[in-house]
Amino acid sequence: MLDETAAMALLAAARDAARAAYAPYSGFAVGAAILTADGTTVTGCNIENASYPLTMCAERVAVGTALAAGHRAIQAIAVATPAAPGGTPCGACRQVLNEFLPRDGTILVVLEGSRGPEQVPLASLLPRSFGPADLNRARDGESGGRQDSSRQ
């Protein structure tokens, strides 16, 4: 867990990022701030598009920005939705974040709680996730306890 000061600072960075959001269609600004494993903070905002499926979520913009700067491990991400505090990453963003788990296997998601920052492990938002380890098991011929129903 992040200490209270670090969680509040990360959430403040996410709120600042939300101010840069391009949301002319929904008016729903979202900001995200990533804390990388080396302590760097990287932000992103949502970028809407008239072709709605091409909209980029703040979390994925922040991940892309972090990757472009050479960061690969994410310690925490704060998400700010000023119009409706307490918003969480969508399913697609949860899956993308899961791709960049640090060695300890935990990414903290910092949300705007009613009494201050609320820290939630990504695993609780994405139970039974699919990630790189699943592909490694498949490549190595391990089932990982899952049965292929087509072979029964």
Residue ranges of predicted features:
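Short, well-ordered amphipathic alpha-helical segments that serve as non-catalytic structural scaffolds
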Residues: 13, 58-66
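Short acidic-glycine loop/turn motifs at beta-strand connectors
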Residues: 36-38, 113-114
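C-terminal binding/interaction regions
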Residues: 1-23, 71-152
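Alpha-helix C-terminal capping segments
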Residues: 35, 65-71
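Short beta-strand scaffold segments in enzyme catalytic cores
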Residues: 27-36
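Short amphipathic alpha-helical face segments that pack within enzyme cores
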Residues: 57, 61, 92-95
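Compact, glycine-rich, soluble single-domain proteins
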Residues: 46-60
